[in-house]
A protein has these predicted regions:
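Sequence-level preference for short, compositionally simple segments enriched
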Residues: 1-117
Length: 117
């Protein structure tokens, strides 16, 4: 998920077939805000970058945060959270948008260094 604002909780683990958290295998959040709780459920690998979260909960094998306000403290390997205060270098993918005249345009983000929310 990129560039979203979730007002409330965000639960990222499916519930299915009476199997509690279900099965899920990882994901990514960037340039986003979650006002309340993020629960990754059974996610096994996860990367969150340059975002703001209320409270982070769960994660199974390897959860990485860079430049994330509200991230859990560095604690690898137990629990398996790797937390870095800034994102050293990143570049977002280009994306389409509609300008003020209704025309489609392509925005190409610039290189970002040492970003932090």
């Amino acid at each position: 998920m990129r560039r979203v604002h979730i007002i409330g909780n965000l639960h990222m683990g499916p519930t299915n077939q009476g199997n509690g958290q279900g099965y899920s295998s990882g994901g990514f959040i960037a340039d986003s805000r979650v006002d309340s709780i993020v629960s990754t459920g059974s996610q096994q690998q996860w990367y969150t970058r340059d975002s703001n979260v209320g409270v982070w909960y769960d994660g199974v094998w390897n959860t990485v945060f860079s430049g994330v306000a509200g991230a859990p403290p560095q604690s690898f390997p137990a629990p398996p959270d790797t937390t870095v205060a800034t994102t050293p270098v990143s570049r977002e993918k280009p994306y389409l948008y509609i300008d003020s005249t209704g025309k489609y345009r392509v925005f190409v983000p610039s290189l970002d260094r040492k970003s932090v929310v």
